[in-house]
């Protein structure tokens, strides 16, 4: 997180302007801060009166519409779903996109990978193995990620190369996710997965940077997102 000085544009005292070579104007001079941010934040300060405090034990439910289109091209056919997951999970390497949607995009990438189907060789580009998936619908996600920002109907496209062991190729993803404010019931996002492709759901989710736990009811909950994936 940037320091408050950087956010406010404050610089060290006595530094000269790089453009003019003269002493900086008053607004560039260092000042003593009467308030040093620390937790908990005083709700009386501007802009924090409705700030959500993340309680890791609080279970929330997010309902949304989603679409995911995925194309994976590889130099050779994948043998197992683990090979597929290892390749596709690199889709958000050097991620540039909407930060608030990233955990949900990770889920959609995981979802898309479980529904990939091989394209007939005669139709594949240059005869190389290709896999495609297209999933859309409504769903809800039980999670402990804290309050999420509003999600608008804006598609985002990602294209990333992968080089995993014997496999080299590209992953292309187009994903859309936005808030569902209707009162209609929706299935859990996990119900859209093709679970026949893998046995250890928790392990495969972690490959995509998703840390999930199972409730007493047997339903999966997104606890957090791994910072190492």
Swiss-Prot record:
Entry comment on modification after translation: Phosphorylated by host.
GO annotation terms (biological process): symbiont-mediated suppression of host mRNA export from nucleus; symbiont-mediated suppression of host transcription initiation from RNA polymerase II promoter; viral budding via host ESCRT complex
UniProt name for this protein: Matrix protein
Keyword Membrane: yes
Biotechnology: VSV is used as an oncolytic agent for cancer therapy, because of his wide host range, rapid replication and mild pathogenicity in humans. VSV used are mutated at M51R in their matrix protein. These mutated viruses cannot successfully infect normal cells, being unable to counteract the antiviral state induced by interferon-alpha in normal cells. Cancer cells are impeded with responsiveness to interferon, and then can be successfully infected and lysed by the virus.
Topology with respect to the bilayer: Peripheral membrane protein
Similarity section: Belongs to the vesiculoviruses matrix protein family.
Species whose genome carries this gene: Vesicular stomatitis Indiana virus (strain 94GUB Central America) (VSIV)
Biased composition (Low complexity): 1-10
GO CC term, one of those recorded: host cell nuclear membrane
Short motif dynamin binding, span: 2-4
Chain positions of motif PPXY motif: 24-27
Stretches for region Disordered: 1-23
Source domain of life: Viruses
Compartment(s): Virion; Host endomembrane system; Host nucleus membrane; Host nucleus
UniProt domain comment: Late-budding domains (L domains) are short sequence motifs essential for viral particle budding. They recruit proteins of the host ESCRT machinery (Endosomal Sorting Complex Required for Transport) or ESCRT-associated proteins. M contains two overlapping L domains: a PPXY motif which interacts with the WW domain 3 of NEDD4 and a PTAP/PSAP motif, which interacts with the UEV domain of TSG101.
Alphabetized UniProt keyword annotations: Apoptosis, Eukaryotic host gene expression shutoff by virus, Host cytoplasm, Host gene expression shutoff by virus, Host membrane, Host mRNA suppression by virus, Host nucleus, Host-virus interaction, Inhibition of host mRNA nuclear export by virus, Membrane, Phosphoprotein, Viral budding, Viral budding via the host ESCRT complexes, Viral matrix protein, Viral release from host cell, Virion
Subunit structure: Homomultimer. Interacts with viral nucleocapsid; this interaction contributes to the virion assembly. Interacts with the viral envelope glycoprotein; this interaction contributes to the virion assembly. Interacts with host RAE1-NUP98 complex. Interacts with host NEDD4 and TSG101. Interacts with host dynamin. Interacts with host NDUFAF4; the interaction inhibits viral propagation and is independent of interferon activation. Interacts with host GTF2H5; the interaction may inhibit host transcription.
Disulfide bond entries: none
Pfam families xref list: Vesiculo_matrix (PF06326)
